[in-house]
Amino acid sequence: MALSTLEQKLTEMITAPVEALGFELVGIEFIRGRQSTLRIYINSDEGITVDDCADVSHQVSAVLDVEDPISVAYSLEVSSPGLDRPLFTAAHYRQFIGSDVSVVLRIAVQNRRKWQGIIKAVDGEMITVTVDGKDEVFALQNIQKANLVPHF
């Protein structure tokens, strides 16, 4: 998923503090709106608790207060990726080969922006998703949003 310049800057800024607390920074989303939201996804082998999210929120807030990279009012949310985990990097897609994924593209392919299928392969920055038995290849830069699709 292509990150905006702000999201790239924020990722660089908060990766070290998150990792210093013993967590993996899975990714971030900055959602602009009437009430903008900075959403941070963290993970660890032991799982994530509410206290873990609070600790990361406190640490990240301190960094953001000093650096002040966001010019508008926003809410900070810290959470685990969850069952419908967002995918941000080629490594994330590689980790979940064989899993169902929902993809929203920035620029339509075959007149479609929304796709759902099974992650088949990752080759550099190209992601292959099998949709209705046919392989579709998407450039990571063209993926606006992607999430795993949980099955219950």
Swiss-Prot record:
Signal sequence range: none
Biological processes annotated in GO: ribosomal small subunit assembly; translation
InterPro entries listed in its UniProt record: Ribosome_maturation_RimP, RimP_C, RimP_C_sf, RimP_N, RimP_N_sf
Record-linked Pfam families: DUF150_C, RimP_N
GO cellular component, one term: cytosol
Keyword line: Cytoplasm, Ribosome biogenesis
Subcellular location: Cytoplasm
Highest taxon of the lineage: Bacteria
Family: Belongs to the RimP family.
Its biological purpose: Required for maturation of 30S ribosomal subunits.
The protein's name in its UniProt record: Ribosome maturation factor RimP
Organism of origin: Sodalis glossinidius (strain morsitans)
Gene: rimP
